Curated annotation (Swiss-Prot):
<protein>
    <recommendedName>
        <fullName>UPF0735 ACT domain-containing protein LSEI_1046</fullName>
    </recommendedName>
</protein>
<feature type="domain" description="ACT">
    <location>
        <begin position="68"/>
        <end position="143"/>
    </location>
</feature>
<dbReference type="InterPro" id="IPR045865">
    <property type="entry name" value="ACT-like_dom_sf"/>
</dbReference>
<dbReference type="InterPro" id="IPR002912">
    <property type="entry name" value="ACT_dom"/>
</dbReference>
<dbReference type="InterPro" id="IPR008310">
    <property type="entry name" value="UPF0735_ACT_dom-cont"/>
</dbReference>
<comment type="similarity">
    <text>Belongs to the UPF0735 family.</text>
</comment>
Amino acid sequence: MKQFYIVDSSMLPEVVGKVIAARALLQNGEVKQVSEAVKQVGISRGTYYKYKDYVFLRDPEMASRKAVISLMLHHDRGILSEVLTTMSQVQASIVTINQNIPIHNWASVVMSFDISALQGTLDDLVTKLGDIRGVSDVHLVSVE
């Protein structure tokens, strides 16, 4: 299994930053060929190919934490709105919502949301959602 480290760039050889810069030139379309990119940043093609698949900038999107919950909502006006208001109050940023049609007046809902700025714990959120009138079977499905 691979191990990954987060390391301050000042601790790495200068070529690592240049490889990342060369890759960015290629991805952004500023240059068309590897030879142009490496010439522009001042490294050899061999150095680029040696490191290109192993060094990356930290992606801010990957730094966010995600959670998925499932719940059942009674088919009454305003219940989903109250769930979303509760999510907003604790700074849970909704990423996706999937609501099925109500069967016997109950609809299943699965929501994924960003919890990187969550105020409180996931257990508190699950409890708050379960306390809403018309909400039942609140389950935390996964956390990344």
